[in-house]
């Protein structure tokens, strides 16, 4: 009986230690969500304005930029998968990788070879464990992405896309680089504290649309030196903005998923501690009852012996 009580107390102590860790992680994630949401909101005006400027440029310039032109028979598709660097965030990474696998299968059905790029150690480990090629990976900033990181990723993707313009099947063409004909991104959209959704979107060839108040007046722009030159200079930045927005949404989603997972773990630890405490109290009561019974039995035996 004593050994059972000691084991229960040991388990209560272990559950309490785990609860402290999960509660701390929950509080940290909660504080990061607000900051991540603020960064998402702060980045939107720039994304909106660069989209509007590009739309105005597109109206004024000939739409023949390589990033806008559909290729007749696309053979290779670049897929950027945004995951987390750390775990303990529930089904966050599993959902992203599930959508990525669905896109992978769809591209295969369409006769396209997926070329994988990843952000975050979890996606990198996933593909490395399965011996599947990752063309390039970026890690270490999933919880707090910076624009410089998004720019570096976008530069790599744009370079691969432009290199694919002269490819013929597996022939890399004149530049000697085997590029891609499409670019897709898989990440998690942050909708609310309770809702995040993994999505896959094509980002090249791009379709530029006006973003703003539908009923409001559009801004008139004057372009120097000319619309075509500015269009070519801004389009890669637009792609970097799309990547950065996805990274920010993913960071907010990661923190929200981690908070939800850690809260569930903390609640489970509470329930476990309550159950083990009741069990330990019951065992202790049984032990006391047994000891009292043994004492009473001993007293009665002594009394009987004295009576004789």
From Swiss-Prot:
Pfam families to which the protein is assigned, alphabetical: ATP-synt
GO biological processes: proton motive force-driven plasma membrane ATP synthesis
Record keyword Phosphoprotein present: no
Predominant place of localization: membrane
Gene Ontology MF term list: ATP binding; proton-transporting ATP synthase activity, rotational mechanism
SUPFAM superfamilies the UniProt entry points to: ATP synthase (F1-ATPase), gamma subunit
CDD domains linked: F1-ATPase_gamma
Highest taxon in the source lineage: Bacteria
InterPro entries: ATP_synth_F1_ATPase_gsu (IPR035968), ATP_synth_F1_gsu (IPR000131)
Keyword Membrane belongs to the record: yes
Keywords: ATP synthesis, Cell membrane, CF(1), Hydrogen ion transport, Ion transport, Membrane, Transport
Gene Ontology CC annotation, any one: proton-transporting ATP synthase complex
Membrane topology of the entry: Peripheral membrane protein
Subcellular location per the Swiss-Prot or TrEMBL entry: Cell membrane
Function: Produces ATP from ADP in the presence of a proton gradient across the membrane. The gamma chain is believed to be important in regulating ATPase activity and the flow of protons through the CF(0) complex.
Family affiliation: Belongs to the ATPase gamma chain family.
Quaternary structure annotation from Swiss-Prot or TrEMBL: F-type ATPases have 2 components, CF(1) - the catalytic core - and CF(0) - the membrane proton channel. CF(1) has five subunits: alpha(3), beta(3), gamma(1), delta(1), epsilon(1). CF(0) has three main subunits: a, b and c.
Protein name (Swiss-Prot/TrEMBL): ATP synthase gamma chain
Organism: Mycobacteroides abscessus (strain ATCC 19977 / DSM 44196 / CCUG 20993 / CIP 104536 / JCM 13569 / NCTC 13031 / TMC 1543 / L948)
Upper taxonomic lineage: Bacteria, Bacillati, Actinomycetota, Actinomycetes, Mycobacteriales
């Amino acid at each position: 009986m004593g050994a059972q009580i000691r084991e229960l107390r040991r388990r209560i102590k272990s559950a309490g230690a785990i609860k402290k860790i999960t509660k701390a992680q929950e509080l940290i994630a909660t504080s990061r969500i607000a900051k991540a949401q603020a960064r998402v909101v702060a980045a939107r005006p720039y994304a909106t304005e660069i989209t509007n400027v590009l739309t105005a440029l597109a109206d004024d310039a000939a739409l023949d930029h390589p990033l806008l032109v559909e290729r007749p028979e696309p053979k290779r598709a670049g897929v950027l998968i945004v995951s987390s660097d750390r775990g303990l965030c529930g089904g966050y990474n599993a959902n992203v990788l599930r959508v990525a696998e669905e896109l992978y299968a769809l591209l295969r059905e369409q006769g396209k070879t997926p070329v994988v790029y990843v952000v975050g150690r979890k996606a990198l480990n996933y593909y490395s464990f399965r011996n599947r090629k990752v063309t390039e990976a970026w890690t270490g900033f999933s919880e707090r992405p910076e624009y410089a990181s998004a720019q570096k990723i976008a530069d790599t993707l744009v370079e691969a896309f432009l290199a694919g313009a002269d490819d013929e099947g597996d022939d890399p063409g004149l530049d000697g680089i085997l590029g891609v004909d499409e670019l897709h991104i898989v990440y998690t959209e942050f909708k609310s504290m309770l809702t995040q959704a993994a999505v896959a979107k094509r980002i090249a060839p791009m379709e530029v649309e006006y973003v703003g108040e539908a009923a409001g007046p559009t801004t008139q722009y004057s372009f120097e030196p000319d619309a075509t030159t500015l269009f070519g200079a801004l389009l890669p930045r637009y792609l970097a903005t799309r990547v950065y927005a996805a990274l920010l949404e993913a960071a907010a989603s990661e923190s929200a998923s981690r908070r939800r997972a850690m809260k569930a773990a903390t609640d489970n630890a509470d329930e476990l501690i309550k159950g083990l405490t009741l069990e330990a109290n019951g065992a202790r009561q049984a032990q006391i009852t047994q000891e009292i019974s043994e004492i009473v039995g001993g007293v009665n035996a002594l009394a009987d012996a004295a009576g004789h």
